[in-house]
Amino acid sequence: MNREIVGRIAGVGSRWPALALLSILWAPVAAAQVVDATSTTMLRLKPEWQAGDTRNGVWGTELVGLSVRNIEVAGVDDLNIQLSAWGQLSSLKDSIYTGSTGDIDLLYIQGALFNHHLSLTLGRQLVSGGAARVLQLDGVNGTLMFSRAFGVSAYAGAPTTSRFTYPVGEFAFGGRAFWRPSYGSEVGVSFLEIISGSVLSRQDVGVDGRWAVLPNVSATASGIFSIQEERVADASVTLNWQVLKDLEIFGKGAHTSPDLFLPLTSIFSVFADTNRDSAGGGLFWQITRQAGLYLEYQRLWVDGGNGDEADARTTIKLTRKSTMGLEARFLFVPTNGVTDLRAWVSHSLNEKIRLSADVEGTVLKNPVNATGGSIVGTASATWAIGSGWNAMLSGSLGATPFFQTAATLTARIGYTFSNWQQKGAAK
């Protein structure tokens, strides 16, 4: 496991000693009304392609989750503790995939004070909304409600680096003020600043809102402006219209500056596209009780010129136990393009066992390794064993630009525990 991550979790040189926090707060757990726990173990055999060489490796992953709710402490409402963590072992060294490592994704305590006027969250958490986008943070987050309609939130702490993310800085703080004039409507103004050492890594302001214009018409919009760069980092607007009970149409537009999603201190921002704009719309139509259709088209404006993106999906319920689907996605920009087609089917043998299969083919405009596409088929079986246990076995076989033949095998077993039936339901 990464030593920096372990040090941060255990409090060795850390400003947020999460492990110490957990040990202090664990005492009230015995009085908790509801405890939910999950454990998932996965084994995966798959190939790895690196510098023209192919080798097979085995990855073992363990994911655990714990939710402790309704902890009874005088003066505190909705007190709960949440934990989500994972660990992984790999048979390959220097793998291009995630190797032998692990981390804590979430570990926080949360509660409400003063008749729910103040809510506090302390520990490793996800801060979302407004200029924060989605920020994983070791710190504190609070929301103060002045009335049912108006409130402010503020947070501060150390941003963390998790799977599939990059370091964004060493200290972050920000907040959001919001107004909820009616059910389904909310507008907000927000701010975020991230510091890396003594250098400014990000400084953004944001506005966002959703509005129920009519009972069947709603609109959402958001925008984030980089103060340092004096440019819009991200903006979007979407209009939804429920024309009929079974028909919804929508239109949307967006502007993205990918380089502003990276820290201002990152050298990779030089290589990122400057702008990406899109506009289009689509629909979802439940044609019959057995068939549904989703269509979407976007016109693209990118640095190199114009492009098009389209998505079509249909789901058909063949019988009470069988369902099939067809999907197609097309993306074309001036210098590249991809066409992706997928078909899948799912069938329930009984209440506990479900079988599924799919085949996916991709056609590339520009060949990779002298190969113009890929095709991969997958078959899987899931089994709800009972008493909280479940299992899955899945295998894939196909050819990709990186492998003449690619085969993967995945096995998973999971366990879920909850005392909600005994305590939560009775209460």
Name the predicted role of every residue range:
Residues 12-17, 346:
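Intrinsically disordered, low-complexity Ser/Thr/Pro-rich tracts
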Residues 1-14:
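N-terminal secretory signal peptides that target proteins for export/translocation
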Residues 32-427:
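Gram-negative and organellar
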